[in-house]
Amino acid sequence: DWNALPGSFALKPNRGFGGEGIIVVYGRKKNRDDAWVKANGSVITIDDLRTHIRNILDGSFSITNTPDIAFFEERLKLLKLFKPYAYKGIPDIRVIVMNKVPVMAMLRLPTKDSDGKANLQQGAIGVGIDMATGTTTTAVLGKAHIIEYVPKTRLALSGIRIPYWKDILRIAVAAQEVSELGFLGADIAIDRDRGPVILELNARPGLSIQVANLAGLKGR
């Protein structure tokens, strides 16, 4: 029953890569039961969702170019701390874990260019995090452009203290143990009411985290 969908949610491919194929909606279209509104203000209908799901099932966004699974995910509530830094979407923390040790992390902030998604390949901001203190350091816009401030503001990206930092690291390590992968990137968001929540696990977490931290994984 399409009408049973909540006012806000995310639709994702199971084996997607680089944020491709993800749709995030922020509320129902006023006076319509068959449509929702996305971050950029555009409208998406039930027919649009059906078409997108067919594309996901056909493997259009699959990293292996094979038939995939589509799933709906609840949209979390934004933590007040991140409100000035994030454009509409929910930030998350990507933690790289290798052999049960968290070795690198970054805060990912959605932007207007990324359509409210915390994905650097689509134009989000990545901010390196000091592993000992959970405090942000250097930042990158997209995949390679080093920045100091939130675009078009004087809001510094360094010096943000990540709440629940030790809990986030523990969750990331536990996720790696359960997955039985020796190396992965755990994406963890902080819900306003529930605290840290796992969004997804990535067997190929990308290279941008090294740029954001101005450091290579090999040295860790």
Which positions does each model-derived feature cover?
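Intrinsically disordered, low-complexity Ser/Thr/Pro/Gly-rich regulatory segments
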Residues: 127-157, 168, 172-175
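C-terminal active-site "lid" helix and adjoining low-complexity regulatory extension at the edge
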Residues: 149-167, 177-181, 190-220
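Phosphate-binding site of ATP-dependent enzymes
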Residues: 37-141
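Glycine-rich phosphate-binding loop of ATP-grasp-fold ATP-dependent ligases
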Residues: 10-53
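A short, polar/proline- and glycine-enriched secondary-structure boundary/capping micro-motif
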Residues: 22, 113-122, 208-213
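Short amphipathic alpha-helix with an adjacent loop that forms part of the alpha/beta core around
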Residues: 1-4
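Short, surface-exposed charged micro-motifs
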Residues: 94, 187-189
